[in-house]
From Swiss-Prot:
Its main location: cytoplasm. The keyword Iron does not apply. One of its GO terms (biological process) is single-species biofilm formation. The active site is at D177. This is EKC/KEOPS complex subunit BUD32. Signal peptide: none annotated. GO terms for molecular function: ATP binding; hydrolase activity; protein serine kinase activity; protein serine/threonine kinase activity. Residues 15-296 form the Protein kinase domain. It comes from Candida albicans (strain SC5314 / ATCC MYA-2876) (Yeast). Component of the EKC/KEOPS complex that is required for the formation of a threonylcarbamoyl group on adenosine at position 37 (t(6)A37) in tRNAs that read codons beginning with adenine. The complex is probably involved in the transfer of the threonylcarbamoyl moiety of threonylcarbamoyl-AMP (TC-AMP) to the N6 group of A37. BUD32 has ATPase activity in the context of the EKC/KEOPS complex and likely plays a supporting role to the catalytic subunit KAE1. The EKC/KEOPS complex also promotes both telomere uncapping and telomere elongation. ATP binds at I21, S22, Q23, G24, A25, E26, A27, L28, V29, K61. PROSITE patterns: PROTEIN_KINASE_DOM, PROTEIN_KINASE_TYR.
Length: 296
């Protein structure tokens, strides 16, 4: 089945090398070394896009047709969902909420060509929030001096993730599938900052959101609480020994952005009101989740 789908997407992007990196119910995600407009592998002079973090690897997301749907209905659904996802990402970019930059689109064929965020961790995995925590857990087992419960970098990254989600929700935007796999960590080298002393330079991570196939716009505290609960549960299931600490740091960051001085006094008050409503609703969502677990 996968070979058939790969052959199908190759019809829409001919002569483009593709490596499948994930397959979901709605879409396939490929990695490619080819930019749709620039030949970065050529020795010829070219203009690099200043907005892209990566000029060697790109992502192609493809929504395949569904054979059980009428062709016209299928086209409308895929086109509508692709347009919706792209609009959501453009809105994020305008708000400076970190996400991949869009390079090219083909709405009729359900294709989004975008930049590839993140990098490879020392163990060879992509630097998603989940994989990074897994890597640190493996390092902790080998080195007793490492303690994830009391690690300044882990605390900072978790708070940054919480701040990122807070900014998303303050703009009444819902991710819809907020797992730790859909948060990518991008390395930032402080040496690139001219104000940084070269002897004191270091590398830290900035989080970005990916995969907006289930995204939506909503000001409801319920929808924001469900977003947070999905991430809480994802962390609990994959990092159970550290979940309480990690989720606590995440909520600290989430609260920090609602209290942020980057907003004027009126917006601060509104942010605090929204925060109160969301946290209260989150407690209700947690309670429902526990009841479902008890009932099986």
């Amino acid at each position: 089945m996968t070979d058939h789908l790969i052959a199908k997407v190759q019809e829409h992007v001919p002569n483009i090398p593709l490596k499948i990196i994930s397959q979901g119910a709605e879409a396939l995600v490929f990695e490619t070394s080819v930019h749709p407009y620039y030949n970065y592998n050529s020795s010829e002079k070219h203009h690099e896009s200043p907005s892209l973090h990566n000029h060697t690897t790109f992502i192609i997301k493809y929504r395949p047709t569904k054979p059980y749907r009428h062709p016209k209905i299928d086209l409308q659904i895929n086109k509508s969902r692709t347009i919706g996802e792209v609009k959501f990402m453009y809105k994020l970019s305008k708000l400076n909420i970190a996400c991949p930059n869009i390079i090219s689109t083909d709405f009729n064929n359900g294709i989004i060509w975008m930049e590839c965020l993140g990098s490879k961790l020392p163990n060879g995995t992509i630097s998603s929030f989940k994989n990074w925590l897994w890597y640190l857990e493996s390092q902790e087992k080998e080195d007793p001096s490492i303690n994830l419960h009391d690690d300044d970098q882990v605390e900072l990254v978790c708070q940054k993730v919480g701040q990122l989600i807070g900014r998303l929700h303050l703009n009444d935007m819902i991710h819809g599938d907020l797992t730790s796999s859909n948060i990518i960590l991008t390395e930032v080298d402080t040496k690139k900052n001219e104000d940084t002393d070269a002897n004191n330079s270091s590398v830290y991570f900035e989080p970005a959101l990916i995969d907006f196939g289930l995204s939506s716009f909503s000001g409801l505290a319920e929808d924001k609480a469900v977003d947070l609960y999905v991430l809480e549960r994802a962390i609990l299931s994959t990092h159970s020994n550290y979940a309480d600490k990690l989720n606590g740091w995440l909520l600290e960051g989430y609260q920090q952005i609602h209290d942020s001085i980057e907003f004027n006094k009126t917006k601060q008050q509104l942010g605090k009101s929204k925060l109160k409503d969301t946290i209260k609703r989150l407690e209700d969502v947690r309670l429902r989740g526990r009841k479902r677990s008890m009932l099986g």
